[in-house]
């Protein structure tokens, strides 16, 4: 689980091999209908609103049309403690962009 203080944008990177990967964050499903081979990865960036497949050679391809369309794949992660759920059959990295209007207090 993760704890977030304000609604936050994210970057989700899912590593192949995997077919139709889904990660649930706070009960919300982030799903892309795609097949990734070993060495490829999928990158969802909620801030830029992009969904890209990155090949072994680093070439990027937009796969925006492969996203699940019933729910927005760019929905920000809500504040609070959020459980992360996935089938455990693939690896992923989740980067949360916590933004503040004031700097953190330094003591």
Name what the model sees in each region.
Residues 1-107:
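Intrinsically disordered, low-complexity segments enriched in serine, threonine, and glycine
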